């Protein structure tokens, strides 16, 4: 059996732009992509903290160090500049891999720069047996 697990997320990034006339996607600062281990053209889920909307799109890289989080195409209707979002990527894992699985979490500052990276070793592994007593 394989389970779809959170691979990485960019937490509480601020939307910097919206371009309705572009074909689609989300443009993300290349430094954020590298820190999160998210690849160009990888599918991501975006959760808008301001309006509760969640949607899926794919990633294109923005200039490194720019802080850009730009929604393109139809996604531009789902957030406005200034909205805070969580950008999540997922991975399929075997049941044995899940036992030691922990995602990479990238925390950003007010300018969408990497503030802190919580890598797998910084988070507890998933407890497959349920809550401890």
Curated annotation (Swiss-Prot):
- Active-site annotation: 25 (schiff-base intermediate with substrate), 58 (proton donor)
Record keyword RNA-binding present: no
The UniProt catalytic activity note for this protein reads: L-aspartate + H(+) = beta-alanine + CO2
Q: State the similarity comment.
A: Belongs to the PanD family.
In Swiss-Prot or TrEMBL terms, this protein is called: Aspartate 1-decarboxylase
Could you list this entry's UniProt keywords, alphabetically sorted.
Autocatalytic cleavage, Cytoplasm, Decarboxylase, Lyase, Pantothenate biosynthesis, Pyruvate, Schiff base, Zymogen
Record's subcellular location:
Cytoplasm
Its Gene Ontology biological processes?
alanine biosynthetic process; pantothenate biosynthetic process
One matching Pfam family: Asp_decarbox
Cross-referenced Gene3D superfamilies: 2.40.40.20
Pathway(s) the chain acts in? Cofactor biosynthesis; (R)-pantothenate biosynthesis; beta-alanine from L-aspartate: step 1/1
